[in-house]
Amino acid sequence: MKLRANRVGEQMKKELGDIISRKIKDPRVGFVTVTDVQVSGDLQIATVYISVLGDEEQKESTLKGLAKAKGFIRSEIGQRIRLRKTPEISFEFDESIGYGHRIDTLLHEINKEGKREE
């Protein structure tokens, strides 16, 4: 069953990227990248992880815009993916990109310090 949830998640990720970039006209929704979709084993709940280009204020307004368009997004997903019941969608920020950037910065600083000591 987990395999099916993963396949549905990947398909939803692809469709959500298209829906958010092309169909949503809300000016609050900025440049959004869908980084991952986690679907529960019973296919009832989908957590969508997004990355937003901009500062904290833009991120919050994008999240509000997506929350407002949640019903439209869910109906579009229901039309594009044939499931008995379309999963309930929730949006969350993907912090892994910022975390990866922080690790990259720290490694770069360590590398600089190593060169200075030589």
UniProtKB/Swiss-Prot annotation:
Record-linked InterPro entries: KH_dom-like_a/b, RbfA, RbfA_dom_sf, Ribosome-bd_factorA_CS
Localization per record: Cytoplasm
Keyword Cytoplasm listed: yes
Pfam families associated with the record: RBFA (PF02033)
GO molecular function annotations of the record: ribosomal small subunit binding
Example GO biological process: maturation of SSU-rRNA
Signal peptide as annotated in the record: none
Keyword Disulfide bond in record: no
GO cellular-component term (any): cytosol
Keywords: Cytoplasm, Ribosome biogenesis
Primary role: One of several proteins that assist in the late maturation steps of the functional core of the 30S ribosomal subunit. Associates with free 30S ribosomal subunits (but not with 30S subunits that are part of 70S ribosomes or polysomes). Required for efficient processing of 16S rRNA. May interact with the 5'-terminal helix region of 16S rRNA.
Family according to the record: Belongs to the RbfA family.
Subunit structure: Monomer. Binds 30S ribosomal subunits, but not 50S ribosomal subunits or 70S ribosomes.
Protein name: Ribosome-binding factor A
Organism: Bacillus cereus (strain Q1)
Underlying gene: rbfA
